[in-house]
Amino acid sequence: MRLKEWLVGVVPEERLARLSSRFHVIGDIAILYLDPELNGYKDEIASALLDQCRNVRTVFNKITPLEGERRTSRLELLAGEGNSVTVHLEFGFRYHMDVARVFFNSRLGYERMRVAVQVKAGEEALVLFAGVGPFAIPPAARGARVVALEKSLEACGWLAENARENGVAERIAVINADAFSMAALLKRRFDRAIVPAPYGMDRIVDALPGMLRRGGIIHFYTFKKAQQIEGLKKSYEDLGLEVLLCRRCGNVAPNVSRWAFDMEKI
């Protein structure tokens, strides 16, 4: 979206250079990441966004990085209705949530569908760091039996509501628990594990082979520099995993990208 183009002549050129053209749209809410040097132009920026994005009713500015177990940021209302509860539509699925209180990344929609279309009816799938359900609900809709672990009690509530909303409540077991407790809680093995790991949670991959049947598939997400990837592949192979696919799926910081790994337990 061409946010900078909308503000030419409104925000001075030297300040406009500090504006990121990227922002999240979740349902009818837009979330910006404004440089402090743009504080004097918040109203103009938010108004331009509301004018150009007819589906957006509320604009927030993220004023802290992700923090706490809920992986949420403090949000500052810039314009609009001020309601942080919304419904996000993605490939025919509806996700209810409060963006001020739960984590959701609207830019992973393609990845969620890429993974979901690989799921076969009758599979047993484990989803860790499940959030409000975007990685759990599509596999259930394809006929999988899903166990979804999420540490945030509030996110679990939204996940259960979203499972009902999307007609898959009978195929999803929602468990409010730390992902690292999975082996103790779930004394069973799965056909597939879907793990959109938060930053700094890479050690979870060590426990995944023990949760899978032979031939089971892991979809794992991590944050790395490109030069780290070959070493990472070797470490996964040492765990008894064959890397089937490795792809970059978004930049998150200078020289740091989100990487998707599809791996098979051999």
Question: What is the predicted function of each stretch?
Answer:
Residues 1-266:
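SAM-dependent transferase fold signal centered on methyltransferase-like domains
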